[in-house]
Structure formats: structure tokens, C-alpha cells
């Protein structure tokens, strides 16, 4: 099982705190260690030491808990990746044209009030969960930590369970091509 986390860490922190019960003799943390092979999380900002990324800042204690106690591999897709790998609006709209009124297009228009290229914050995390490292460079191992102000820090460490995604101008087109191939296929036809 792979978990793609694209929001606050609240539910994942609660999962770690879940005791054994009538449904399983294992705690939540034990179940994660036994059943999950990867947590792919959109979280943090690694290049600006003062940036409080939204998903982390909304529930700092839960983010701290998840990244400190998660028992298996975590791959983080940081803010700067999603803001740099923009999905061009015309292609985004074309890829979702299989639906007469696609809810994603409608919600983007309602939010932005205009056509605009889309950040891929959450999409990069999901793409890694679905497709692995094919479009990305993955950092070496380390620890991904959240301080009390909600600032994220990655510290390289051979025994760390965290890594983060990297990409650059040369690889952004491949990332967008991957999104396009997934989004342009009507629901249920993958």
C-alpha cells in the first residue's frame, strides 16, 4: 500500500496514535509498518528557511508527529517543486476535455476567476506515489523535521527514512507529460 498525503497531517498523526482494538491486534503505527511501503507527502519548503508551507502550518503538531514517528519510507514533494512545474492552462483544459464540464476545470475557474497555469503541488506527490521516480530525481536519505514554527528542515542522514523530490527546467516537461497521459484518459479507463 502507498499513501499519498496532499493536505494536513492530522489524520496520519491520528493513525499513528490508534491503539489495537477489536478489528486488529496491531496499533496504527504497527499497521503502517506492516502494510504501507511508502508515504508520498506534499509538505514543506526546503529552499526558504522562513517559509511556512500551508499543509504543515495548518497543523504543526500533527506534521511534527508524522515526520518524527512514521515507521517507513517517506518521500516529500516540497512546495518549490509544485510551484515550479506549472501545468499550462491550455494543455490542462485539453487533457480534461473528455468531460463536458469537468469539476477540476470548473473549480479552478471559480477559484482563480480566469484561465491560468496550474501549480502542481499535490499532483507531484500523487504522481510519485503512482509512478515512482521516473520523472524525478530523489534526494539521498535523511530526516525531514518540522520545528515549532512550522518550518521544515531536511537533514541528510544515512539512516533517515525521508527523501525529497527534485526536478529542474529540463525535467518539468516530462512531469507535465506524465500528468497529461494520466489526466487525458477518461475516468475508469486506466
Walk through the language-model features, giving the residues of each:
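N-terminal acidic, glycine/proline-rich low-complexity segments
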Residues: 1-190
